From Swiss-Prot:
<dbReference type="GO" id="GO:0005506">
    <property type="term" value="F:iron ion binding"/>
</dbReference>
<dbReference type="Pfam" id="PF00067">
    <property type="entry name" value="p450"/>
</dbReference>
<keyword id="KW-0256">Endoplasmic reticulum</keyword>
<dbReference type="InterPro" id="IPR002401">
    <property type="entry name" value="Cyt_P450_E_grp-I"/>
</dbReference>
<keyword id="KW-0472">Membrane</keyword>
<dbReference type="GO" id="GO:0020037">
    <property type="term" value="F:heme binding"/>
</dbReference>
<keyword id="KW-0560">Oxidoreductase</keyword>
<feature type="binding site" description="axial binding residue">
    <location>
        <position position="451"/>
    </location>
    <ligand>
        <name>heme</name>
    </ligand>
</feature>
<keyword id="KW-0349">Heme</keyword>
<comment type="similarity">
    <text>Belongs to the cytochrome P450 family.</text>
</comment>
<dbReference type="InterPro" id="IPR017972">
    <property type="entry name" value="Cyt_P450_CS"/>
</dbReference>
<dbReference type="GO" id="GO:0031000">
    <property type="term" value="P:response to caffeine"/>
</dbReference>
<dbReference type="GO" id="GO:0016705">
    <property type="term" value="F:oxidoreductase activity, acting on paired donors, with incorporation or reduction of molecular oxygen"/>
</dbReference>
<dbReference type="InterPro" id="IPR001128">
    <property type="entry name" value="Cyt_P450"/>
</dbReference>
<dbReference type="InterPro" id="IPR036396">
    <property type="entry name" value="Cyt_P450_sf"/>
</dbReference>
<comment type="function">
    <text>Is involved in the breakdown of synthetic insecticides and may be involved in the metabolism of insect hormones.</text>
</comment>
<dbReference type="GO" id="GO:0005789">
    <property type="term" value="C:endoplasmic reticulum membrane"/>
</dbReference>
Amino acid sequence: MFVLIYLLIAISSLLAYLYHRNFNYWNRRGVPHDAPHPLYGNMVGFRKNRVMHDFFYDYYNKYRKSGFPFVGFYFLHKPAAFIVDTQLAKNILIKDFSNFADRGQFHNGRDDPLTQHLFNLDGKKWKDMRQRLTPTFTSGKMKFMFPTVIKVSEEFVKVITEQVPAAQNGAVLEIKELMARFTTDVIGTCAFGIECNTLRTPVSDFRTMGQKVFTDMRHGKLLTMFVFSFPKLASRLRMRMMPEDVHQFFMRLVNDTIALRERENFKRNDFMNLLIELKQKGRVTLDNGEVIEGMDIGELAAQVFVFYVAGFETSSSTMSYCLYELAQNQDIQDRLRNEIQTVLEEQEGQLTYESIKAMTYLNQVISETLRLYTLVPHLERKALNDYVVPGHEKLVIEKGTQVIIPACAYHRDEDLYPNPETFDPERFSPEKVAARESVEWLPFGDGPRNCIGMRFGQMQARIGLAQIISRFRVSVCDTTEIPLKYSPMSIVLGTVGGIYLRVERI
């Protein structure tokens, strides 16, 4: 009994100490900040009634003209430097990257192997993994995978055509799920070499498990908040974050795929094959002569896992939001269709790698979609050493401090993007892009830790949208929700319910 009492006193004392130390952090340093909530910090409503983006919009708009390049923020229990000056963001992501190379995210390779993927890794582990994976995402590899994506997109067109009668007015379709089925089949083929066929059979474990990654948590809210606030401690305590059924499904899938390929000596020029080679070689010599260790089964599974979940969700959401905006802006849709059809006529009606790249207005439309609907609301970095902010010698981002770069808020800053709520692809004309700082548009991050799969994600979104817009017209209908409502339970920008649009054959 006394042991239990002493234990409770010790735990209470530790919590009180952590609360006092963390929640007085910015006050002691004289940095502007909002007073934190005892449980939620500056994120009251987290995973309850507020979308992550809203925290960052509101905080940025409150402090962006404060005169400080960064202000204090409490990401739940974790003090963080909230970057309101885009020039400082540029320094952190690019110029002074070596001091902010880590993200400081939870990962526990021993007990929760799927968390040790490229997005979460830090230090030498991240550097080595990035070097291993970079050859998979070259333009040459994209060209090789292009026919595979085209093949899936042709089946995609057939499925839509079957649901849309030739008669006037077409049919009302739920776009979000349809786009997700397309990208699931693409990623399943390119990552695993598996014919998922979710376009024809929407209910599948592959699709269900992919969805769960973005909506389900292994723990309740309090434990989840603890892991987010103290990722290193959570890892030392051997905590896990991946839902058990998701963990079991992907580990079994990867093990079975590897066993089959090694047994049959079957090779494909895909993501999985590169990783299997890294696993088999044990050590790999890079082009610069550096020798790095190979990859064990847990590391391999984690990289395939993140390629799948990041690739299908982000691209499908981008396509859905893009069609939603095109349905409301028929003039933009008509201009885009004219470009696509003109380019196709020059290529005898065939979508090729070169023709997709030639569709410059399509690229502008997608870029504007990613600005207005920023899927990942912020970037995180961690200071590896004390960092004196240039031009502000009394402002220091101390070693170990988390850094938040609110990308979604930059994207809706009226000083950077006049009339930010208006969908306007002209913002991304070549002239305007050249005149803009790269850190003012961050859907894929920037600098050495930008999104390694950017080329692939853009390729599949361009192909899918080109196939749709060249054959169908999308418009709003009575069931189209304007404006959209977003789910606070999703870790990316996801809607509550579907996106319904009228689809008609051209």
